[in-house]
């Protein structure tokens, strides 16, 4: 990796909230409020997308489509997406307050990068009202990044590269080849690849981890979309970067 200048982290499941529990709990509660029971697996499947897109993707799940038709007598439409999205925020804020602990090694890895003159930034699929709470909770624990972008800051969220370009603008760092994206979902990888960055995927702290039995399949999923490196957690980042020549 030549002249690494900037590391862009995802937040939930990468820096905070082991297992990315807050979004899962929020979406289950949101759909329950609408009279639709969804499983953790269904709630997790679109993880990494902006939250409106996350809701749209859940509604396209065949089981959810069938249940929605049974409850409402018609398919879900854009009005329903908008209504659910408006109702989503209180559920997410409540869940963030429960699941906002820093992931072990996050502070140490950020400190290690800064000591080497490497800037640190974050991108998130949360809307600003929720993202601001995430950043505050992290700051209260001693972690504050140099720049942040959320879904509301750009025209299109992941898998588009626009949030990465936004934090590159905020830090005045370029080219993309000097940027590394670290996250726990497929959309994180796609965001990084579409921006022209290197990408690292974390296994054990994200929503997809279901114990060692899931290691091989999850690793394969990340590698199939082109991630450059799979690591267990953000705690492993300094060692991996140090072993790469010319960082």
Feature-to-residue mapping (PLM):
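Asp-based, Mg2+/Mn2+-dependent phosphohydrolase catalytic module
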Residues: 1-4, 107-115, 127-247
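N-terminal helical cap/lid subdomain that shapes the substrate entry/recognition surface
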Residues: 2-107, 111-116, 132
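Structural motif
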Residues: 46, 123-125, 182
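Glycine- and other small-residue-rich loops at beta-strand/loop junctions that grip anionic moieties
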Residues: 99, 123, 156
């Amino acid at each position: 990796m030549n002249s690494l200048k900037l590391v862009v982290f995802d937040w939930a499941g990468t820096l905070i909230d082991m297992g990315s529990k807050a979004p899962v709990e929020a979406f289950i509660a949101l759909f329950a409020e609408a009279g639709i029971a969804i499983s953790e697996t269904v709630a997790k499947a679109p993880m990494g997308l902006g939250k409106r897109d996350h809701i749209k993707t859940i509604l396209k799940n065949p089981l959810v489509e069938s249940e929605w038709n049974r409850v409402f007598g018609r398919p879900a439409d854009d009005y329903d997406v908008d209504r659910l999205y408006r109702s989503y925020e209180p559920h997410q804020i409540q869940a963030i307050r429960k699941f906002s602990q820093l992931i072990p090694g996050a502070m140490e890895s950020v400190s290690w990068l800064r000591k080497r003159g490497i800037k640190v930034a974050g991108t998130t699929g949360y809307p600003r009202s929720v993202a601001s709470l995430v950043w505050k909770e992290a700051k209260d624990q001693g972690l504050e990044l140099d720049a942040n972008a959320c879904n509301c800051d750009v025209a299109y969220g992941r898998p588009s590269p626009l949030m990465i370009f936004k934090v590159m603008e905020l830090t005045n760092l370029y080219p993309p080849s000097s940027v590394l994206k670290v996250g726990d979902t497929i959309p994180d990888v796609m965001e990084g690849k579409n921006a022209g960055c290197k990408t690292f995927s974390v296994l054990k702290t994200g929503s997809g981890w279901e114990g060692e039995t899931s290691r091989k399949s999850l690793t394969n999923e990340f590698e199939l979309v082109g991630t450059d490196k799979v690591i267990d957690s953000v705690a492993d980042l300094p060692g991996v970067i140090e072993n790469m020549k010319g960082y």
